[in-house]
Amino acid sequence: MKLDKKIIEVNNLKKSYGDIEAVKGIDFYVDEGSLFAFLGLNGAGKSTTIDMLCTFLKADSGKIKIDDFEVNKDDDKIKSLIGVVFQDSVLDDLLTVKENLKVRSKFYNMSKADFNKNLEEIAYVTGIKDFLNRQYGKLSGGQRRRVDIARALINKPKILFLDEPTTGLDPKSRKSVWDMIRRLQEENNMTVFLTTHYMEEAAKADYIIIMNEGKIEAKGTTYELKEKYAKDKMIIYTKNNTFFMHYLSC
């Protein structure tokens, strides 16, 4: 994986809701083709940041560049480059999977031929081919999440934003979705920007930022963060501490 271009650049980004400072002047960048994770508890400012990056929410101040395009100046171009998976699905329970994806393709003025071509590729890579003609509302949680990701991929974006993509899923479904995300990123050199409150999910990323109360508390690779903050220790419980300590001192 070649990481030589900053596809997302954020400088001194701020956002408040009344007296509440949701994002407090953060700075970071994301390398093209990387899997990037925002880790933090609910209310840390992760979703607000994603909404600003995706042009859904206007920042109070600061600067955002997506693939060299500036948010608030080049929003239409930026929207054509990104796909977004929200915490809550935006698809119609009463429509089939294929119908939902076709509706989404209309946002990009996609021709029927292009839609069918993209659908075939996306259905294969996301594993939704077997239930394309089933109603979205009748799918399992894991299947629905796969369709949500397929919706975000219909325009073949350069950057995929995933806001808490596995929340509410059982461990097996979470693993399945994660395997798919990693495969998409590695095989297509796609940049994946993830928010999560699961430590084990963030640990799979190439680079991690830990947010708390609107601020960046720590950042680095998994290895760098472990080296700096984690202390390895072994706890041994014994029935006879005196006997055990004798052998430790030998």
Features from the language model and the residues they span:
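Conserved ABC ATPase signature
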Residues: 135-139
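ABC ATPase "signature
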Residues: 219-220
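Conserved catalytic motifs of ABC-family nucleotide-binding domains
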Residues: 156
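Conserved ABC transporter NBD signature motif
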Residues: 62-73, 77-78
